[in-house]
Amino acid sequence: MAQFEWVHAAWLALAIVLEIVANVFLKFSDGFRRKIFGLLSLAAVLAAFSALSQAVKGIDLSVAYALWGGFGIAATLAAGWILFGQRLNRKGWIGLVLLLAGMIMVKLA
């Protein structure tokens, strides 16, 4: 793997943000009944994968994907709480903690 460069971390951060945007648009689309939000969601997913493809040029795929997925889930959870009033129960919080612990383990491996 090439030496770490901040540009790859920036691409990964962009991929995470775009994934969150895609998920929020998907919720707004109401099961694709509101087509513009559905299309925006698809465009954001495509852009997220494009950014992820740039990130993996300098970050191991397993690490990049774990971080992308984990931070994407955690941030989407926060967006659901802020925008839609969605809350996690105790089991949900335990799952989130396990997810974050798994991300740390993958990064340290």
Curated annotation (Swiss-Prot):
SUPFAM superfamilies: Multidrug resistance efflux transporter EmrE (SSF103481)
Topological region Cytoplasmic: 27-35, 85-87
Keyword Transmembrane helix attached: yes
Membrane topology designation: Multi-pass membrane protein
Keyword hit for Cell inner membrane: yes
GO cellular component terms, semicolon-separated: plasma membrane; transmembrane transporter complex
Annotated phenotype, changing residue 19 to Q: Decrease in spermidine excretion
One MF term in the entry's GO annotations: amino-acid betaine transmembrane transporter activity
Binding partners and assembly: Forms a complex with MdtJ.
Alphabetized NCBIfam families for the sequence: PRK10650.1
Functional note: Catalyzes the excretion of spermidine. Can also confer resistance to deoxycholate and SDS.
Identification of the protein by name: Spermidine export protein MdtI
Gene: mdtI
